[in-house]
């Protein structure tokens, strides 16, 4: 049976508890939003296929629990991850401060993974405490892209997921190109070595 996609990528959504990770996932995967807050126990995931530059990309998006007591569960889910979405709540300064810790955790668990920073709940200017300028400055220092989103109002959610997918797709193609180049170099070396051996005879 033929596959209905060209690429399969695993994405992970991490961040403090209550920042809206599940809401972002539900908005992107099912285009739904629920105002009631339920803590995710352990890990939940959704699947959605998107098209990027004419290629079908199947996304397996894992929503992890942000609470400290679930940290051990979370660490096992980094395996095989291609992209990580780090979420903070623009109405919670603490969740923004904790982004550094989450980025450190990514570095501890993943060798080479694409990352983006997401400031969620960006739909009530009066409650916003993490300034856009500060967030952009921090993202620049970390070398990652920033998106301010609202799962509630459906603002920038699609764009954010498309961005991380494009980053992962580009990284995959770059890695393939490097591998092919390395193989060509190895073939050239082998050919040169065999010619040298013939001359020695």
UniProtKB/Swiss-Prot annotation:
The modification Phosphothreonine is found at residue 72. Mg(2+) binds at residues 22, 40, 63. The keyword Hydrolase applies. It is a lipid-anchor. A lipid is attached at residues 200-201 (S-geranylgeranyl cysteine). It is found in: Cell membrane; Membrane, Clathrin-coated pit; Cytoplasmic vesicle, Clathrin-coated vesicle; Endosome. Signal peptide: none annotated. PROSITE patterns: RAB. It comes from the Eukaryota. GO terms for molecular function: G protein activity; GDP binding; GTP binding; GTPase activity; phosphatidylinositol-4,5-bisphosphate binding. One of its GO terms (biological process) is cellular response to nerve growth factor stimulus. Changing residue 62 to A: Loss of interaction with ACAP2 and RUSC2. A motif (Switch 1) lies at residues 30-42. It is an enzyme of class 3 (hydrolase). Its EC number is 3.6.5.2. GO terms for cellular component: cell projection membrane; clathrin-coated endocytic vesicle; clathrin-coated endocytic vesicle membrane; clathrin-coated pit; cytosol; endosome membrane; extracellular exosome; intercellular bridge. Changing residue 72 to D: Loss of interaction with ACAP2. No change in interaction with RUSC2. Changing residue 4 to A: Decreased interaction with RUSC2. No change in interaction with ACAP2, OCRL and MICAL1. A motif (Switch 2) lies at residues 64-80. SMART domains: ARF, RAB, RAN, RAS, RHO. It catalyses: GTP + H2O = GDP + phosphate + H(+). Its cofactor is Mg(2+). SUPFAM superfamilies: P-loop containing nucleoside triphosphate hydrolases. Belongs to the small GTPase superfamily. Rab family. Switch 1, switch 2 and the interswitch regions are characteristic of Rab GTPases and mediate the interactions with Rab downstream effectors. The switch regions undergo conformational changes upon nucleotide binding which drives interaction with specific sets of effector proteins, with most effectors only binding to GTP-bound Rab. This is Ras-related protein Rab-35. It comes from Homo sapiens. The gene is RAB35.
